[in-house]
Amino acid sequence: MTIEHKRSSKGEIEDLIKARYSLIWITSPEETRVEESLRKLCVEREMRLEVWSITEGFKTIANGQGTRDVKDPMKAIDHVMRAEGRALFVLRDFHPFLKEPAVVRRLRDAATELRKTKKSLLVLSPITKIPPELEKSI
C-alpha cells in the first residue's frame, strides 16, 4: 500500500498494520515527522521500531542502539526476516536499490513471508518509484 504522508496517515498506517500488510510505502520528504508518528504508533501498539539507512544501518528508535554493520540492502532485508517479535522496520531512501533485480526479488519474497508474522516493512522515500514487479506487493 502506498501512502502520501499527511496528518491523518498515522491512523491509515495503523489500519494497514492491523490488516497485516507486510510491505508499505510512504512517500514524504518529512522523514523526521513520519518517524515520530511511527514511533508513537509503535509505543501504542507495543511494537519495536527499527530504522535503516545506507549510512547508519539499523537502529532501534527507542534506545538508539542497533545493528550498524547492516548497511547492505540485501542484508537489511535479511535482518528484517530474521528478527523476532512484533516490529515495524523502516527502510529510508530505499528506492535507488530497487533497480537491482535481486533486491526486488528479495523484497517480494519478504512481503510473502512477513504476512505470516507480526512484522511490517515500510519504505520511506521522498519519491514514489515502485518497480512494476512490486506494485501488487505494496
Predicted regions mapped to residue ranges:
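ATP/nucleotide-binding catalytic cores
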Residues: 2-138
